[in-house]
Amino acid sequence: MNSKLSLPGKNLKMQKRRWKPTRMMLTRAHYRVDGQLCQHWRTNWQTSRGSLQIWCQVKKWVKSLLTRLGLSRMITSRRDQAFDMEMSLM
């Protein structure tokens, strides 16, 4: 029997770990001419531009609905302002 096979007790630490979502996603991996592995990473935010645009449309619709109903809009947070700024640059 191969001595390098892992025993069940050694994998206990790995079994306790849970998958956590990352902020980066591997979009492409290939080998260069010199044989080195080249990996292209992209933030999850960039990979979901379609859903991001849908979210912006919904957000604008809700804001306009609140305005038409005469309700005062809540003060937008700095995060929302940065988000709107990012969408205007696209």
Swiss-Prot record:
<dbReference type="GO" id="GO:0042025">
    <property type="term" value="C:host cell nucleus"/>
</dbReference>
<keyword id="KW-0945">Host-virus interaction</keyword>
<dbReference type="GO" id="GO:0044220">
    <property type="term" value="C:host cell perinuclear region of cytoplasm"/>
</dbReference>
<keyword id="KW-0899">Viral immunoevasion</keyword>
<keyword id="KW-1048">Host nucleus</keyword>
<comment type="similarity">
    <text>Belongs to the hantavirus NS-S protein family.</text>
</comment>
<feature type="region of interest" description="Nucleolar signal">
    <location>
        <begin position="4"/>
        <end position="29"/>
    </location>
</feature>
<protein>
    <recommendedName>
        <fullName>Non-structural protein NS-S</fullName>
    </recommendedName>
</protein>
<comment type="subunit">
    <text>Interacts with host MAVS; this interaction may reduce MAVS ubiquitination.</text>
</comment>
<comment type="function">
    <text>Antagonizes host type-I IFN signaling pathway.</text>
</comment>
<keyword id="KW-1035">Host cytoplasm</keyword>
<keyword id="KW-1090">Inhibition of host innate immune response by virus</keyword>
<keyword id="KW-1113">Inhibition of host RLR pathway by virus</keyword>
<dbReference type="GO" id="GO:0052170">
    <property type="term" value="P:symbiont-mediated suppression of host innate immune response"/>
</dbReference>
